[in-house]
């Protein structure tokens, strides 16, 4: 019997080390950033079983077999649609400003189409204004409405949007609604999902959370886009989820969420429509390619129209393009660079680009919320402050609530607005969208919004920062080491 237990013990020990060696080899063979690989290896060797389970669950980008097959299957039709769209030469911009030229060339070469011109844009900074404008557009819709949100939280004006959407479906408008399973869990547990389906709305629960399939697909891969398209002509996107800030996370102790949305009219709605159609097909298997822009309803094809490139991440879209876009925009800055984000855990490349911009004389400002709803990200963000301050970057801590806006402004002319946080999840993992806008008028509007944020912020004093307690420094460094995994 003793021999039996000895053999079993040795087999368990052997299996244990074979498993660790196998996972280690897999991490080393994967093409990933060195800090990320080192962080995973540290977890696995300090807490082997916890680390192995965590890595197999969320360490690799598993979309799931069915979705991966759909992503491959949709590409031929999507490629044909893009080629057909190129025939609409009147919607594409031929020239860009000097500060935007490199970024627009990057987007065109990687995505296959140029930026679209002739768009009208309106920045909306108040949640009531956003929802009232959205309700008005829904009421005037004539053909179709498509929506996707990470979070839909019932309550307040969000319920009024839901009522208007159901009314549109009842009068024959084709309505589609896609919501992230994890982010919108409160919605799917409420009566609203059934009510909408009964009204004729196609409601899809994207990337369903299923613990039984935790090793087959990443559960933390989330649909983070926020988009609305109406009649293939009107579009919305930005940082705002479908929530009323007066009812959302009131017990988090961070104040009301502060967001930014862009309302657009023009061919950009078609560019955003193909993003939505790809997401819809991956999730449902149904193909809903949008029609080309209607030249008869494009009154803004003049020099006054804004030129926009739409960048999306996720299956079917160029890998790493959003990260490349941020790097290109940062290196293009000559006068000033203002970044606004709720979560700041940059890649080494992006951190280096930001610091280098400041060191070559660019006036660089980063606006972050002073209070954050994510304890882990909040501490990890602080770990980068010393290097940023030493390079001459100004860090503003917003005190008027949880600043949730995601925006970048370069030299008053090149703007990036969308759903992308400056953290690893947005840069490498989630389904995101950002607009790249080449226009001084829009840049002035965004600058006014950012100036308002700065007026409600406190500038971080580098002299006081270096005097913070030792325990804070230790905590920051601990979270910094694991920041590639956040």
Swiss-Prot record:
<comment type="function">
    <text>Catalyzes the reversible phosphatidyl group transfer from one phosphatidylglycerol molecule to another to form cardiolipin (CL) (diphosphatidylglycerol) and glycerol.</text>
</comment>
<dbReference type="GO" id="GO:0005886">
    <property type="term" value="C:plasma membrane"/>
</dbReference>
<comment type="similarity">
    <text>Belongs to the phospholipase D family. Cardiolipin synthase subfamily. ClsA sub-subfamily.</text>
</comment>
<dbReference type="InterPro" id="IPR001736">
    <property type="entry name" value="PLipase_D/transphosphatidylase"/>
</dbReference>
<feature type="active site">
    <location>
        <position position="226"/>
    </location>
</feature>
<keyword id="KW-0808">Transferase</keyword>
<dbReference type="GO" id="GO:0032049">
    <property type="term" value="P:cardiolipin biosynthetic process"/>
</dbReference>
<keyword id="KW-0443">Lipid metabolism</keyword>
<dbReference type="InterPro" id="IPR030840">
    <property type="entry name" value="CL_synthase_A"/>
</dbReference>
<feature type="active site">
    <location>
        <position position="224"/>
    </location>
</feature>
<feature type="domain" description="PLD phosphodiesterase 2">
    <location>
        <begin position="399"/>
        <end position="426"/>
    </location>
</feature>
<feature type="transmembrane region" description="Helical">
    <location>
        <begin position="3"/>
        <end position="23"/>
    </location>
</feature>
<protein>
    <recommendedName>
        <fullName>Cardiolipin synthase A</fullName>
        <ecNumber>2.7.8.-</ecNumber>
    </recommendedName>
</protein>
<feature type="domain" description="PLD phosphodiesterase 1">
    <location>
        <begin position="219"/>
        <end position="246"/>
    </location>
</feature>
<dbReference type="Pfam" id="PF13396">
    <property type="entry name" value="PLDc_N"/>
</dbReference>
<feature type="active site">
    <location>
        <position position="404"/>
    </location>
</feature>
<keyword id="KW-1208">Phospholipid metabolism</keyword>
<dbReference type="Pfam" id="PF13091">
    <property type="entry name" value="PLDc_2"/>
</dbReference>
<keyword id="KW-1003">Cell membrane</keyword>
<keyword id="KW-1133">Transmembrane helix</keyword>
<feature type="active site">
    <location>
        <position position="231"/>
    </location>
</feature>
<keyword id="KW-0594">Phospholipid biosynthesis</keyword>
<keyword id="KW-0472">Membrane</keyword>
<dbReference type="InterPro" id="IPR025202">
    <property type="entry name" value="PLD-like_dom"/>
</dbReference>
<feature type="active site">
    <location>
        <position position="411"/>
    </location>
</feature>
<feature type="active site">
    <location>
        <position position="406"/>
    </location>
</feature>
<keyword id="KW-0812">Transmembrane</keyword>
<dbReference type="InterPro" id="IPR027379">
    <property type="entry name" value="CLS_N"/>
</dbReference>
<keyword id="KW-0677">Repeat</keyword>
<keyword id="KW-0444">Lipid biosynthesis</keyword>
<feature type="transmembrane region" description="Helical">
    <location>
        <begin position="38"/>
        <end position="58"/>
    </location>
</feature>
<keyword id="KW-0997">Cell inner membrane</keyword>
<dbReference type="GO" id="GO:0008808">
    <property type="term" value="F:cardiolipin synthase activity"/>
</dbReference>
<dbReference type="InterPro" id="IPR022924">
    <property type="entry name" value="Cardiolipin_synthase"/>
</dbReference>
